[in-house]
Amino acid sequence: MHIVKYSLEECLAKEATILDRLEEITINSLPIWRLVRNTFRRKIVDDNSRSTVPIIKVTDVLRNFFLSFFGLLKIVLLGKSYSNVFFPHSRLFLVSNQYLERFSDPLIDYSEIGEDYIILERPQNGTHNKPRYHGNKVIYLDFIEIITRICLPVAQQIVSRKYKNQIDLLCKLLNSQFEEANVWKYKVLFSKIVAERLLQYHLTKIVLTRLNPKRIFLAHRETFNYVIAYAKKKGVMTIELQHGITVGETVLYSGRYDARIDPDYFFIFGESNIGPQFSMPIERLRNVGYAYKNYITDIGLNRYPEHYVLAISEPRISDVMVNTLLLLAVSYPQYVIHIRCHPQEKLSEEMLDKISKYKNIEIVSNTYESFCALSQYSCIIGENSSVLYEAMSLHKKVGRINFNGLEVKETALIHGGFKINKVEDFETFMTKPYSDENDSKELYSDFKIENFKSIL
């Protein structure tokens, strides 16, 4: 069967014609459209990205289920309140022998909130990495996740009957614009999503009521929209933490701000991130900087000698990048080039064989978090990877390769670096004084405590 796909631009244009009516459809005052929007878009928008299927250990799931149960039970029984509750991103990184979440953990350290916080952590692929930074403040949400899965089949049947009119109207409206995609086939999926969110809402409500927070921090809004819904009803402030560089329209963020289900504030990494791309009113954006950047600088990781260079590669340019780096390695044997591949990038056997013939060029691990890796080098080179802008924010020398099939691209907000237009320019880059005057340093700025405190 032919599956109809739309470009994101087409999708957004079609949504806009029926958006007012979509937002009027509610269940318990929650806009159904916003509960299903992200999943619906991912079904119909043409997107080449792929995800891997994780291997989940049953023993890990069972152990974390009981740890979560007793942790949540303790919250309910003790009734201790915290002003700040964090729902972090599920992806953790190993830094200085501890796993941390880059967007919330350093923010906790630099924000001066002291011990007045608790972290409610969802599992990633059924596991929780240890040793965990701020581990004594972490409570697992596995119990809520698993109970939701167990109850979901029954809850879905109840939702599909009780809210049949609302779900039918949603499908009818969407099908009027996306008729080729036959939206009615997603009716069961929509009822499942609504049932899942309602279960998560009511289970999490018990915990949050006992915690009685003043503020809830989360990343990101689609994962935790049921938390935002609870907070809105209780008058609790919600703050979403930026979790990546976003430029232009995206499946996740594009749309109209809805105060019923969107966060009250959005913390951005730096001044250059201010814009409409997060679908937040500009006055609700707060440039608090990137506390993780301060954290990495302060812990002082070991550095390579000055003649070591880190090269940033990407799947789109693997072969061209390696061939270009080999040219540099042959021309300048006094420098050692370390190649860091993208996590989804796999070099061919031919490329690996070429690299193995040279002593001054090698592949280094890409499992090390990027800011940690960057902090160990003085010089970073690449083409257009966003990692180069992380390097600029750390005040590194950044060379951008602009020859041999590689082409530097810049925008008004994203720019900078020394352009390496030919092989000989590499020597100039390495030996001459570097000016960072034109570098995009404000994508990731230093943490700004005064901006954080401005909403407290």
Question: Which stretches of residues belong to each language-model region?
Answer:
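Catalytic-core helical/loop segments in enzymes performing group transfer/polymerization on anionic/lipid-linked
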Residues: 1-456
